[in-house]
């Protein structure tokens, strides 16, 4: 007898990047920063009050949210902090996609999107890129939710934020713009996310690529 949910029994899990242990190998497969942290990071850690670790941290990350809000000219109430982008993607899928619903994304892209759809007992709907690897405009009713990776990974092609803004206005679901590589691009969609008229668009950032 299996106690596992029926829709999970066939699931093939997300395969993480290989972690080689051979001497002299240059590791590039998981897009990690090849440089060490700033010396200021070491100074901040050395000055950290270790006694505070015996208590739970602020569950709503107030200070971090206030700082991020000040950087982007928005309210702290518009900022959500997660334990990595994967957690935020998981919460996004569970919050905005019903069981049996659909989540759209371009293909090729980050393979976790489809895995999270299956975990939710939803259907992932890949939308193929154009022959030049640019992102085509998805239909406005393509899915219940859509993840637009910009710049795209793995192609690195960037879509003009104005095009994404136009899609968000016509799209009938919730749009998440995954900007994991935004720090390497000349423009981003943050102004779209913090705009007062925005009702269906979220922008996700990470510290794992450029920091």
In which residue ranges do the predicted regions lie?
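N-terminal "arm"/small-domain region of PLP-dependent enzymes with the aminotransferase-like
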Residues: 1-55, 142
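Short, well-ordered alpha-helices that flank and scaffold nucleotide-derived cofactor binding pockets
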Residues: 43-47, 70, 94, 98, ...
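Phosphate-binding glycine-rich loop
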Residues: 62-102, 120
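Short, structured coil segments at secondary-structure junctions
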Residues: 75, 120-121, 171, 197
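PLP-dependent aminotransferase-like
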Residues: 95-149, 154
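Active-site pre-lysine segment of PLP-dependent enzymes
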Residues: 132-142, 154-210
């Amino acid at each position: 007898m299996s106690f596992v949910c029926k829709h999970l029994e066939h699931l093939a899990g997300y395969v993480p990047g290989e972690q080689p242990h051979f001497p002299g190998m240059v590791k590039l497969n998981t897009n990690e920063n090849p440089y060490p942290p700033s010396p200021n990071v070491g100074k901040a850690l050395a000055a950290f009050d270790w006694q505070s670790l015996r208590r739970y941290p602020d569950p709503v990350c107030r200070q971090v949210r206030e700082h991020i809000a000040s950087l982007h000219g928005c309210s702290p109430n518009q900022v959500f902090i997660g334990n990595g982008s994967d957690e935020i993607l998981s919460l996004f899928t569970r919050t905005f996609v019903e069981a049996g619903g659909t989540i759209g994304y371009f293909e090729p892209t980050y393979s976790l999107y489809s895995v999270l759809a299956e975990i939710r007992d939803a259907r992932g709907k890949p939308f193929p890129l154009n022959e030049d690897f640019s992102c085509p405009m998805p239909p406005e009713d393509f899915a219940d939710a859509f993840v637009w990776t910009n710049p795209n990974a793995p192609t690195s092609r960037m879509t003009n934020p104005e095009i994404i803004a136009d899609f968000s206005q016509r799209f009938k679901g919730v749009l998440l713009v995954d900007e994991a590589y935004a720090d390497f691009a000349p423009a981003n969609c943050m102004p779209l996310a913090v705009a007062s008229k925005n009702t269906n668009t979220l922008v996700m950032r990470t510290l794992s690529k450029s920091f």
